[in-house]
């Protein structure tokens, strides 16, 4: 039987059907291989995650939950979603898990829908001091639908002062208190947040999107025993697909499930749910724990190098003097470089980071006076102590030399590290299997 036009089109490989997209994907693979990725919110997923996410599951609609779908033919995706939920609960010691959120922002929107009503007060870390858009930023849904109040870091220590958080909570009586962050290099005291929430009659929500992988490995205090609800992305330190996850006490299960579907979303992306299931299996391995340990070690090596005499002399400071997590915040307020210039300089060298506001930043958000530098992707790439030390020295030297940096020499050092730790060996351009 001859192929119909539709059958032919459905079996043509990407490079033949759409060479423009294929070339762009090839270019991105080359960029990831040949440069060093140090954006704190990015990571490299295992090839098995790529395979799951690029599977035929992208074809399947599955509104509802396992055993309670609004579509037929869900017997296989039910198995996958159950695996993802059960594994997530095992990894984090949680009573309840919802693996359907398309992204962290959708997870956070569902959490607020479940815990609060429109115009209720919510108390979270200021975006300008390391919080996230979804914690009450005025242009975000969280700042439009709810009365958002922000706590800030102490101007001297650059750390969260729990006594001041308590004072604000007692004064404002929020419905929800939010812990967690997007750019804060220290542990938070979840027990203290719980105590404050209980004192003022608030629910406690922790957004652990950035440090979930460290929690899973037992290398960071877990918010799960303290919080009513915990949300996270799966793609940062966890190293899974770009997507969201909600964990909670069982008492919140019904409200949270309803808030995700039909509250925030229709059908889940089952290819992403499958990739989450794979990521949760990986998170239970010794190799994963080793990777998280190297992530922390790399961040501490970087913080130490950026505290050296040459960088300090160039006006570079490490916010809070160090780090407890996977990222370092470099304060450039006294440097000749602003955040944009520093990001561009490191990009020329072959290291990808992002400019980031520091607390009390005098510069506009598109320029900033800081850099946020993370180590998860390099740990996933296999970097060891010596390699992290070399990368930290490249960054420290570049920031110390500033506009006089020897870009060519520094780029050669970066290229050597990239060659020594190859990425996705055997992956042929855009082909995922």
Swiss-Prot record:
Q: N6-(pyridoxal phosphate)lysine (modified residue): where?
A: 236
Location(s), subcellular: Cytoplasm
Binding positions for (6S)-5,6,7,8-tetrahydrofolate? 127, 131-133
Q: Which PROSITE patterns match?
A: SHMT
Alphabetic keyword roster: Amino-acid biosynthesis, Cytoplasm, One-carbon metabolism, Pyridoxal phosphate, Transferase
Q: Tell me a GO cellular component.
A: cytosol
Q: Which Pfam families match?
A: SHMT
Top enzyme category: transferase
The disulfide bridges present are: none
Gene Ontology MF terms: glycine hydroxymethyltransferase activity; pyridoxal phosphate binding
Q: Which GO terms describe its biological process?
A: glycine biosynthetic process from serine; tetrahydrofolate interconversion
Marked site positions, Plays an important role in substrate specificity:
235
Keyword Transferase appears in the UniProt entry = yes
Names of required cofactors: pyridoxal 5'-phosphate
Matching NCBIfam families, A to Z?
PRK00011.1
Known function: Catalyzes the reversible interconversion of serine and glycine with tetrahydrofolate (THF) serving as the one-carbon carrier. This reaction serves as the major source of one-carbon groups required for the biosynthesis of purines, thymidylate, methionine, and other important biomolecules. Also exhibits THF-independent aldolase activity toward beta-hydroxyamino acids, producing glycine and aldehydes, via a retro-aldol mechanism.
Which named protein is this?
Answer: Serine hydroxymethyltransferase
- State the species of origin: Corynebacterium urealyticum (strain ATCC 43042 / DSM 7109)
Q: Which lineage is the organism of this entry classified under, starting from the top rank?
A: Bacteria, Bacillati, Actinomycetota, Actinomycetes, Mycobacteriales
